[in-house]
């Protein structure tokens, strides 16, 4: 089984995002962008990978529920359905939970995983197991464009066994003025 460990903020949205997601009656988050959702769908279509949530939004999403009760869960469900995607699972809940530990625990419980990719704009939660995670990591940028076509191509390669960490150099140059 191939798996995409998915963060939302900085991957499926970015600082330039216009869409909004309901958090409560009075508070709205930056939403999930349709173009980035289509990019995610391309990865799934070309690799048949399953999506496992690592995002902090995971606490609002009920895995396997036909009807989401939480407004954020409803929003996420609708966005994923529009591009014919399903969320397979999520790592353990917790607001300040180290994502790297969550991914490692999830992988330990699922020995059937043959390949995986991590799509995230933050690497800090993965440093403790750098050797394990780095070859599977595709770094996106909140200040850049999120899940770009370059990131999509890198994720597909990693899921198809061509390991190698990827940081979008075009975004690095645009956002930070460096290469």
Each language-model region and where it sits:
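Active-site neighborhood of HAD-like aspartate-dependent phosphohydrolases
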Residues: 1-48
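Structural motif
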Residues: 3, 50, 115-117
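Short His-Asn-centered micro-motif
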Residues: 6, 54-57, 119-121
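Short catalytic/ligand-binding loop motif for oxyanion handling, primarily in non-cytosolic enzymes
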Residues: 13-15, 60-64, 125-129, 147
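Acidic-and-aromatic substrate-binding clefts and catalytic sites of carbohydrate-active enzymes
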Residues: 30-31, 60-63, 94-97
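Well-ordered, non-membrane alpha-helical segments in soluble/globular domains
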Residues: 30-40, 66-76, 100
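Substrate-recognition element of Asp-dependent hydrolases with the DxDx(T/V) motif
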Residues: 44-67
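C-terminal cap/substrate-recognition subdomain and adjoining C-terminal extension
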Residues: 70-179
């Amino acid at each position: 089984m191939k798996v995409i460990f998915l963060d939302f903020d900085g991957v499926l949205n970015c600082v330039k995002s216009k869409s909004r997601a309901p958090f409560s009656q009075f508070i709205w988050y930056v939403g999930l962008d349709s173009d980035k959702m289509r990019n995610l769908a391309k990865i799934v279509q070309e690799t048949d990978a399953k999506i496992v949530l690592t995002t902090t939004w995971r606490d609002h999403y009920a895995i396997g529920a036909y009807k989401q009760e939480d407004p954020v869960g409803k929003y996420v469900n609708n966005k994923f359905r529009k591009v014919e995607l399903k969320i397979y699972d999520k790592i353990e809940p917790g607001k300040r939970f180290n994502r790297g530990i969550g991914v490692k625990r999830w992988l330990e419980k699922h020995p059937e995983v043959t390949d995986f990719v991590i799509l995230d704009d933050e690497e800090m939660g993965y440093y403790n197991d750098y050797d394990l995670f780095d070859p599977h990591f595709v770094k996106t940028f909140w200040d850049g464009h999120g899940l770009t076509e370059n990131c999509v191509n890198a994720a597909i390669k990693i899921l198809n066994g061509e390991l190698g960490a990827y940081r979008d150099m075009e975004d690095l140059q645009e956002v930070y003025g460096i290469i």
